[in-house]
C-alpha cells in the first residue's frame, strides 16, 4: 500500500504569538464571555503528536478550527522553531482552508458588535450611533467610505485585553520592511 500525502497550508509563527493567542482566547471564553460557544482543546486532548492546541469557533452551522502546531521542521530563520498555525473551515463533511484575513472577517460577522446598517442614516440625522465596532481586525484592508466616516464619528473604546485576531497570529513580522520614524533622509548622504 502506498503512502498518501495530504498537503495543508501551515503559517509559520513565533512561539510567543501562539502563547498570546491562547491567553486571549481563554480570557474571552472564560472572563469577558465575548467568545461564547468557542471550544479550546489543549495538546493532551489531541491524538496528533504535533498539534499543540485547537480552537473550535462555531459560525452558524459551520465551524472555524484554528490549529496550532509544534515540532515542525524549522524554517529559514532560527526563531522559526517549528511552530505553525492552520485555519480550517468545516461544514458537515466539507473542509477547506482559509486565510487569516477571511477568518477574522467571519469571526467578526458572527461574534462581535459592529455598526448596524442604519448607523449611516442615524449619523446623517444627528442621532446617536450605537453600537461601535468592537473587532477592528475583522475589517480587512481600508473599508468602505461609510465605515471610515462612522469610525471617525464614533470614538472607539479600546478593549483590554484585545480580541483574538487570527491575522495577527499568522502575521509575518520578521520579513516586513522596517519603518524608520522621523528620518526623512540620511544626513550624511544629502550632499552637504
From Swiss-Prot:
Protein name: Virion infectivity factor
GO molecular function: metal ion binding; RNA binding
Motif window: HCCH motif: 108-139
One of the protein's GO biological processes: viral life cycle
Topology class, membrane: Peripheral membrane protein
Annotated positions of the Phosphoserine modification: 144, 165
Subcellular location: Host cytoplasm; Host cell membrane; Virion
Pfam families in the record: Vif (PF00559)
Record region (SOCS box-like): 151-180
Sequence positions bearing Phosphothreonine: 96, 155, 188
The protein's role, per its UniProt record: Counteracts the innate antiviral activity of host APOBEC3F and APOBEC3G by promoting their ubiquitination and degradation. Acts as a substrate recognition component of an E3 ubiquitin-protein ligase complex: mechanistically, Vif hijacks a host cullin-5-RING E3 ubiquitin-protein ligase complex (ECS complex) and the transcription coactivator CBFB/CBF-beta to form an active E3 ubiquitin-protein ligase complex that targets APOBEC3G and APOBEC3F for polyubiquitination, leading to their degradation by the proteasome.
Ranges where the record places region RNA-binding: 75-114
Spans annotated as Disordered: 163-192
Ranges where the record places region Interaction with host APOBEC3G: 40-44
Region (Membrane association): 171-172
Residue span of region Multimerization: 151-164
Marked site: Cleavage in virion (by viral protease): 150-151
UniProt subunit comment: Homomultimer; in vitro and presumably in vivo. Interacts with viral RNA and Pr55Gag precursor; these interactions mediate Vif incorporation into the virion. Interacts with the viral reverse transcriptase. Forms cullin-5-RING E3 ubiquitin-protein ligase complex (ECS complex) by interacting with host CUL5, RBX2, elongin BC complex (ELOB and ELOC) and CBFB/CBF-beta. Within the ECS complex, Vif interacts directly with host CUL5, ELOC and APOBEC (APOBEC3F and APOBEC3G) substrates.
